[in-house]
Amino acid sequence: MSGTADVAAVVGAVAVIVADGAAHPVTEWKDEGGLALVRRVAGLNQRAPIICAGAQQASLVERGVNELGISRLRLFGSAPEALRSAIAAIVSLEAGAAPQDISVSVLGRPMQQIIVPWDEASIGGRSATQVLSAAQLARLDARISRLWPPGPYALGSAAARLVRTALTRTPRVHAALVAVTRDEGAPGRSAMMPVTLDPAGIAALVPPALSSRDRVRFETTMRT
């Protein structure tokens, strides 16, 4: 993996990560400049997945899919994976468990519409709702929105993990920012969803097991 400001370097690449611009102060690619960059990247390399690594790049995913016609399986964001890792870290502290023993998903839209389905989360192989009390889960829910946006190192690490999983075809579920279809909710928007990956990009969306309350929250989020 290498970084460059030369757009022509994407020719022949197996994956492309869109992160920061070269200007000072450093800012994420977004808005019209970011969309123009995504257009050039997609034109120069018509096969590689394009991963938007930043926390402010939802519009690139949305507009790239809806305006440029790029497949949502090819153009998506990796910042939700950084958020998922941060959530796993605070769950591990609350539960007194190792972070690698935490399995948790994240859905919705940052930062006020973040949904963690605790019923399907696990800690050391046990259901999170069996390990943690209702008070502990409420305390975690109250902290989650403050974890957004993730820092630059967390964002970079998350993007690298998604690329590694995609290229090695590892059967691992990650959180990604995916453009929403009309059947799923409000078209033209994006949402955090669990996905599996392959060298072409997103292999499949993984439907989470949601409680009645979380399903209502998620469906409401997708419609707005």
Regions found by a protein language model. Name each.
Residues 41-42, 65, 167:
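N-terminal cationic-hydrophobic initiation segments that often serve targeting/anchoring roles
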Residues 2-49:
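Rossmann-like NAD(P)-binding element
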Residues 49-126:
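Rossmann-fold dinucleotide-binding core
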Residues 33, 37, 60, 83, ...:
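General structural feature for long, well-ordered alpha-helical segments within catalytic domains
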Residues 8-10, 43-44, 95-97, 185-187:
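Solvent-exposed alpha-helices and their adjacent loops that cap or buttress functional pockets
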Residues 38, 91, 219-222:
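A generic alpha-helix structural signal
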Residues 96-224:
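Long, compositionally biased stretches enriched for glycine and/or charged residues
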